[in-house]
A protein has these predicted regions:
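Class II aminoacyl-tRNA synthetase catalytic cores and aaRS-like
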Residues: 1-176
Length: 176
């Protein structure tokens, strides 16, 4: 099964079809037998919510694997999840994925990657440049830059131009 981008899931009609989602965990909440995992893949600003009901798991759920994986999950972990896309019963999002299986592809050490659930200041991101790509602000900037570069390249390609990366030729003529 091919993973589906979160931006495509959020704009689709929920019909209970099985989907595969890959991305980074933004938050994990466990409350009274219900587990909520917010996942983002960078394709859009919004997250998709993965849900798991410990008291009433779906018939296809790999319960033991889900429980083991949930112990490893924290903010920043990368996951691959399979589940049914359904209309969300709660307000806040139109659709959600009920977990049938989940795999932790990589954990995130909070000491090496001090990702915060709340918004990180620009000063904090300046000091921790490796975290920029995981923020909504920089993700939006990267998506805009991608669209702009694509438009410029398309414009020139349609007019017969070719793109080339010229090598940098530099010389060092230092004084003193």
């Amino acid at each position: 099964m091919v993973p589906v981008l979160i931006k495509d899931l959020l704009s689709s009609k929920p019909e209970g079809q099985q989907v595969k989602v890959c991305g980074w965990v933004r938050s994990v909440r466990d409350s009274k037998g219900l587990v909520f995992i917010q996942v983002n893949d960078g394709s859009c600003f919004s997250n998709i919510q993965l849900t798991f009901d410990r008291n009433n798991p779906s018939n296809n759920a790999n319960v033991n694997n889900i429980e083991e994986t949930l112990k490893k999950l924290n903010t920043g972990a990368s996951v691959r999840a399979i589940g049914a896309l359904i209309e969300s019963p709660a307000s806040g999002q139109a659709v959600e994925v009920t977990l049938e299986d989940i795999e932790c592809l990589g954990t995130c050490n909070p000491e090496e990657y001090p990702l915060q659930k709340n918004k990180m200041s620009m000063e904090y991101l300046r000091e921790n440049a490796h975290l920029r790509a995981r923020t909504n602000t920089f993700g939006a900037v990267y998506r805009v830059r991608n669209q702009m570069a694509f438009a410029v390249h398309s414009f020139f390609q349609e007019r017969g131009f070719q793109y080339m990366n010229a090598p940098e030729i530099t010389c060092s003529d230092c004084e003193g």
